[in-house]
Regions:
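Solvent-exposed loop/turn segments at secondary-structure junctions
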Residues: 43-45, 56-60, 82-83, 116-119, ...
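M16/MPP (pitrilysin/insulinase) zinc-metallopeptidase core fold and M16-derived inactive scaffolds
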Residues: 49-112, 178-182
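N-terminal signal peptide c-region/cleavage motif recognized by signal peptidases
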Residues: 15-17
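Positively charged n-region of N-terminal signal peptides that target proteins for export
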Residues: 1-4
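Charge-rich, well-structured scaffold segments of protease-associated domains
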Residues: 30, 89-240
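Mature N-terminal segment immediately following signal peptide/propeptide cleavage
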Residues: 22-53
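Sec-dependent N-terminal signal peptides
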Residues: 6-10
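Short, well-ordered turn and helix-capping elements at secondary-structure junctions
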Residues: 33-35, 41, 54-58, 96, ...
Length: 240
């Protein structure tokens, strides 16, 4: 026992400097509207990742309107008041970038990977998503079909495709984890445009989001850009 304890102490002492060296340095601040911002500077490669995490997932949904959080993951690429419909991806990709998003029980997450000289573009695009996204009949009807096809591919036409749904409903009898993020297509079909618009107003707000910027950046310049594009976005007054 003593030898084992001594060996553990020696290994811990050896590993500690390595862990200390791998510590990731970052800076963070919060805007007056509640947006939490985390920045990490790494100038080894001329790229930057910009991401926004919204604290909304399937657990936040009305049990009669499941699938909203995942649906919005798609809808938020429809464009905004200042970005033409369907052009969000084209703009990022035309600048040499990639982008994607995902939804879980707890969060909805969007990101762009771009050359570092396009950081301002990424921040502008995410601010448009947060403040001016198009939530209208055209976008909703378009994305309904996209989500239907996704469900067919990933769930309906897959061996054991329903195993997650069946497991969750048996594991959680009361907790909102009882339904999968894909939700119910019947609920999405029954929802009104006003319900979609209210979901956007409730959850796509700065005080329900964390903005993360990592890569080839300058801290002071990046903070100024964040303030430029996000500081005037109003917070949600109602508690989330």
């Amino acid at each position: 026992m003593k030898k084992t304890t001594l060996l553990g102490l020696i290994l811990g002492w050896i590993a500690f400097p390595a862990l200390a060296q791998n510590k990731i340095e970052f800076r963070e601040f919060t805007l007056d509207n509640g947006l939490h911002v985390i920045m990490h500077q790494d100038n080894t490669t001329p790229i930057v990742v910009t991401s926004v995490l919204y604290h909304v997932g399937s657990k936040n949904e009305n049990p009669e309107r499941t699938g909203f959080a995942h649906f919005f993951e798609h809808l938020m690429f429809e464009g905004s008041e200042n970005i033409d419909r369907g052009q969000y991806m084209n703009i990022i990709q035309s600048r040499g970038g990639t982008l994607n998003a995902f939804t879980s029980n707890d969060i909805t997450y969007y990101y762009e990977l771009l050359p570092s000289n396009e950081l301002e573009l990424a921040l502008y695009m995410e601010s448009e998503r947060m403040l001016h996204s198009k939530v209208d009949i055209t976008g909703v009807e378009t994305q309904r079909e996209v989500v239907k096809e996704e469900k067919r591919q990933r769930v309906d036409n897959q061996p054991y495709g329903s195993i997650l749904t069946e497991t969750l409903v048996r594991a959680y009898s009361v907790h909102p984890y009882q339904w999968a993020p894909i939700g119910s297509l019947d609920h999405l079909n029954a929802a009104t445009i006003e319900e979609f618009q209210q979901f956007y107003k409730d959850f796509y707000v700065p005080n329900n989001a964390t903005l993360t910027i990592a890569g080839d950046i300058d801290y002071a310049q990046t903070e100024n850009l964040v303030i430029k594009y996000f500081d005037e976005i109003p917070k949600r007054r109602k508690e989330i």
